[in-house]
Every structure is written in structure tokens, then in C-alpha cells.
């Protein structure tokens, strides 16, 4: 898929925040389905920017290739979830790996982090996804 305008991700992020504030059911769903999957604190965008500048993190975009090609976090490497086993030997052991996908409720990043940790990698997920990153006017590439 492709978001035609930078305002679209901002609108989606706003709608998500409104739903989170207005619907008690959203809080329960998030707690039951997401927070229980990942005991480690996710990486906030400010932290990721600092880590990347210092060379402390490798950022992987686990979305399908066509989504990555439409736009991605600057410096991120595309490692679609189904291709992760083939990329394992290319991933650095000395750096933390930060995975992201379509947003805070996208299961791809959770799954990638879980698989990486089982293989001995230090991995966390980005707290948000590419749409929120782009809406925040942070560095992106195409």
C-alpha cells in the first residue's frame, strides 16, 4: 500500500490516539494482546535517533518490500518477517536491533523481536511505526 500524502499518516495517528482515549475496550485489547508479548520497554523515537547516530543500533523494517520501497526510516534495512531466517547471519551481534513496521499495533515487529531474542540477539521494537515516524517529520528515505 502507499500513503499518498504526509498528512494521511498524521490523520491515522490522530484517529488512533482518539480511539485509545475514548474506548476502554482498546485499553483492554492492547494490554491483553500487545503488552503481554513484550516485557522490554520499546524504543522511543528520540532514543532511536540517538542510538543510530552513535552506531549502537541496527534498524530493520519488517514490512513487505513494496511498503519499504514506498518509504522507510532513513538507514533502515528491509528484512521482511518471512525472510528473517535468511538474514540472521548478516545481523550484528554487537548492536541492538530495533524492528519496526506499520504502527504500534502491528504484530510484525513483535514477532520479529521475539524470533531475534530466541536466537540470542538483543532486540527491541520501535514504540511506533513508519506512519508515525513520517508524520513526526523525522528522516525518511525512498
Question: What is the meaning of each model-derived region?
Answer:
Residues 4-70, 142:
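Flexible, polar/low-complexity N-terminal or interdomain linker segments that lie immediately upstream
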Residues 14-15, 71, 90, 136:
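Residue-level signal for well-ordered alpha-helical positions
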Residues 44-111, 142:
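Positively charged, proline/Ser/Thr-rich regional signature most characteristic
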Residues 58, 122, 139:
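Residue-level detector of anion-binding/catalytic polar loops
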Residues 115-117:
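Hydrophobic alpha-helical packing residues
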Residues 120-135:
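A short glycine-rich beta-strand->turn/loop micro-motif centered on a GG-aromatic cluster
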Residues 136-142:
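Short, basic/aromatic-enriched C-terminal tail that caps enzymatic domains
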